[in-house]
């Protein structure tokens, strides 16, 4: 069973053990958003150059939001659409009322939500229509022709967990009524970034990336067919740019690139490769490249981060996004940290207003943040209820508290009713566990919260303590980033925790015992659905085959169900 990712925490949590009840008992209840109001991963970021106060952000599982006051407030404009997973947003330069949205997270991860194609608005985001490419599933980037809003190019990543034909570069010339695949390599190689030459829309660049997310936590971030390509005839034909860049022999993976508006022959690239990775520069429109910086802080983890942008009016000023953001003012020779307040990490996307370059928009793991003065001050991201939540739990106190693991921010909790009625970002607290945590409040003591793998948090003292089984340190037992943790509903003293075996403690983690054998397959091989693209990483990754779901009977303390991530379901009655 895959993770369920929630855009909002819901006040009412329906547990797996809930009995069927009459709708008459709850039909008058209404959902309300209670946060959290610190956002999670955001990768779509764009503004309108001629309307410098207007911005659009695309959230991995939160849809599309619009701000008309430089990020002070955000309003959802995509809630009535069938997907909340967004990879990119593009506004037509010639008619800013025309907006295209590419769905799917546009990332490479073991836990993501796929999309169902491209959406279009012709009224500034008030209404939307679906315009195709359903089975691309992951759209990394889309761009709109500078003078013709009906011409759009899409960089399609394709299926994240297996091969498919819907990968590569797609083009429409009629506003999305029909699409043509204009560049395709194979069933495992997708496109993740595409850009126009700023002065000639007949010239395009695209990064083709051969990669695949395997089952469990194992993945391949490079393949023989990855590379940077260029078209000079509007996308009809393409050639690979290789002079000076790493290739298949060097384990080339993802390439992120930026083009100078003021000097289109100047390109920068952040190149992820097992050998010779780094920041590269071209001064002849990509025909040749030079390695100018090897500092891994700038390009490391290139499968996750590959953002590099050039100042619109100065080709020597360049920004790159990685775990942190960095800036260079000497053509990429030297760099220093350039962060958006209030901090945060994992900088996925940067949009710079081409007419007012002091206006910049970062999309990061904590949401959207905007500066209007070149980075001196930034807007808050504590106004964006777009978080990705792993699991939801409630306790027994009054008013009851709601807990969960928030992507990129750790495990958190809040009372279901604020002191002033409305719940704000100030009401949420960290509870000392990780972002993927299943959270288990103690049924007998609401001040004790268990979470993750496994921390015990005391709300009164604010202290956290690791109470995981000591035997886990031996390396004998398998764990993934999110694992089941729950109190047995028929025995408030019994805390259950799943690895590849099921653990039980009756005293808050002071002593643990194993109550099951290994419930997973002996040989969890890579499934045939992965296709021919099997790499050493996929075959040798150790963290696979765990108990992924546990449910206990509220009527019988001896009855427990367990499901594994390699497709098995078990039950015990003793």
Feature map (PLM): residue ranges:
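Beta-propeller blade termini and top-face loops
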Residues: 19-574
């Amino acid at each position: 069973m895959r993770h369920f990712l929630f855009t909002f925490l819901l006040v009412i949590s329906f547990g797996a053990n809930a009995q069927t009840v009459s709708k008459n008992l709850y039909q008058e209840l209404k959902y309300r958003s209670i946060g959290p109001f610190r956002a999670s991963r955001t990768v779509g970021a764009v503004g309108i150059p001629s309307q410098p106060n207007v911005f659009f952000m695309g959230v991995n599982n939160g849809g599309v939001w619009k701000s008309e006051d430089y990020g002070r407030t955000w309003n959802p404009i995509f809630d009535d659409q069938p997907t909340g997973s967004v990879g990119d947003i593009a506004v037509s330069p010639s008619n800013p009322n025309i907006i295209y949205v590419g769905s799917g997270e546009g990332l490479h991860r073991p836990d993501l939500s796929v999309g169902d194609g491209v959406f279009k608005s012709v009224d500034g985001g008030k209404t939307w229509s679906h315009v195709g490419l359903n089975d691309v599933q992951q759209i990394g980037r889309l761009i709109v022709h500078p003078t013709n809003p009906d011409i759009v190019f899409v960089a399609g990543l394709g299926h994240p967990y297996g091969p498919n034909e819907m990968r590569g570069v797609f083009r429409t010339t009629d506003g999305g009524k029909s699409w043509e695949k204009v560049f395709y390599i194979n069933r495992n190689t997708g496109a993740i970034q595409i850009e126009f030459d700023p002065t000639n829309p007949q010239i395009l660049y695209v990064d083709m990336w051969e990669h695949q997310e395997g089952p469990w936590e194992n993945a391949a971030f490079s393949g023989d067919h990855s590379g940077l390509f260029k078209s000079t005839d509007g996308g009809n034909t393409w050639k690979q740019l290789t002079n000076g860049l790493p290739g298949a022999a060097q384990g080339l993976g993802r390439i992120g690139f930026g083009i100078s508006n003021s000097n289109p022959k100047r390109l920068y690239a952040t190149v992820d490769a097992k050998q010779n990775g780094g920041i590269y520069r071209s001064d002849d429109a990509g025909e040749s490249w030079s390695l100018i910086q090897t500092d891994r802080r700038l390009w490391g983890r290139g499968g996750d981060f590959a953002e590099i942008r050039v100042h619109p009016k100065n080709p020597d000023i360049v920004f790159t996004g990685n775990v942190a953001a960095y800036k260079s003012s000497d053509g990429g020779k030297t760099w220093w940290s350039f962060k958006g307040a209030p901090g945060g990490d994992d900088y996925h996307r940067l949009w710079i207003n081409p007419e007012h370059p002091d206006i910049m928009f970062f999309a990061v793991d904590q949401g959207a943040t905007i500066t209007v003065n070149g980075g001196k001050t930034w807007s808050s991201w504590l106004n964006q209820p777009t978080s990705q939540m792993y699991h939801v739990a409630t306790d027994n106190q009054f008013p009851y508290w709601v807990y969960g693991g928030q992507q990129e921010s750790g495990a958190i909790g809040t009372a279901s009713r604020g002191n002033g009625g409305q719940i704000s970002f100030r009401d949420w607290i960290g509870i000392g566990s990780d972002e993927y945590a299943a959270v288990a409040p103690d049924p007998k003591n609401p001040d004790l919260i268990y979470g993750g793998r496994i921390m015990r948090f005391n709300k009164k003292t604010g202290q956290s303590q690791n109470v995981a089984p000591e035997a886990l340190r031996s390396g004998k037992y398998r764990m993934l980033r999110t694992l089941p943790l729950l109190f047995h509903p028929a025995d408030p003293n019994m805390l259950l925790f799943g690895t590849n075996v099921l653990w039980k403690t009756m005293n808050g983690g002071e002593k643990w015992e194993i109550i099951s054998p290994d419930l997973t397959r002996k040989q969890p091989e890579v499934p045939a659905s992965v296709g021919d693209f099997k790499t050493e990483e996929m075959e040798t990754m150790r963290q696979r085959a765990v108990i992924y779901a546990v449910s206990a009977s509220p009527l019988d303390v001896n009855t427990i169900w367990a499901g594994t991530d390699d497709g098995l379901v078990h039950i015990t009655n003793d």
